[in-house]
A protein has these predicted regions:
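Extended hydrophobic/aromatic-rich secondary-structure runs
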Residues: 5-11, 15-16, 147, 156
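Hydrophobic, well-structured modules enriched for small/aliphatic residues and gly/pro motifs
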Residues: 1-5, 46
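C-terminal non-catalytic interaction/assembly regions of soluble proteins
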Residues: 124-190
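Short acidic/polar alpha-helix capping motifs at helix-coil junctions
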Residues: 2-3, 18-20, 99, 157
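Short glycine-cluster motifs
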Residues: 17-18, 65-145, 149-153
Length: 190
């Protein structure tokens, strides 16, 4: 269908994998470079495993957005740095957030928090603070086009309530929110 988004796995990307594909079914054993070029020309997102395919498929369920400026909202610094690297390598921008609005947001967070982007509201951050940060990114930070929210559970905040806040904000925010939930296995009522 015209306009649909497609993700695909093409196995046999390594030399050994290509040999294995040839021995099983020769039709699949095309040069990896050719497959990459074909996928790129056709707008197909290449995935290298089932988990990645499922993740990309999930991302496709979110609305398309214009722009390249992403706010990363987190209570865990390490994952935010890794996401910053990954998004930057993919051609997206993680613009520095500063000025009066940023200073104002910082006063609403616990000491030690950072709002420069990534916005890190610490492991002790609350669901209410998460909601406030999302509101600022949605309505006060004009240079932001979308948000990635990383929220897991270091055991210091009620995760169920944080996920409820995140779900509500995803329904009402004007800018898209992409959740990254490393602790969904423990997301039930505490």
């Amino acid at each position: 269908r015209k306009g649909c988004r497609i993700a695909a796995i093409k196995s046999g990307s390594s030399e050994a994998g290509s040999r294995a594909a040839s021995s099983h079914t020769g039709a699949l054993a095309s040069p990896d470079v050719a497959v990459d070029a074909l996928f790129k020309k056709a707008g197909i997102v290449r995935c290298y495993g089932r988990e990645e395919l499922c993740t990309v498929g999930n991302i496709f369920t979110y609305p398309h957005f214009e722009g390249k400026n992403i706010a990363i909202i987190t209570h865990a610094g390490g994952p935010a740095v890794m996401l910053t690297d990954a998004l930057s390598k993919a051609g997206l921008n993680i613009p520095h957030i500063e000025g009066k609005q940023a200073d104002e947001l910082l006063t609403k967070l616990f000491p030690g928090s950072a709002v420069g982007n990534p916005i890190d509201f610490l492991a002790t951050g609350t669901p209410e603070q998460l909601g406030t940060i999302i509101d600022y990114c949605d309505t006060k930070f004009d240079g932001i086009d979308a948000m990635c929210v990383i929220f897991g559970t270091p055991g210091l905040a009620p995760i169920h309530e944080a996920y409820r806040v995140l779900s509500d904000k995803m329904k009402t925010a004007k800018k898209p929110i992409f959740p990254i939930l490393p602790s969904t296995l423990v997301a039930g009522e505490e």
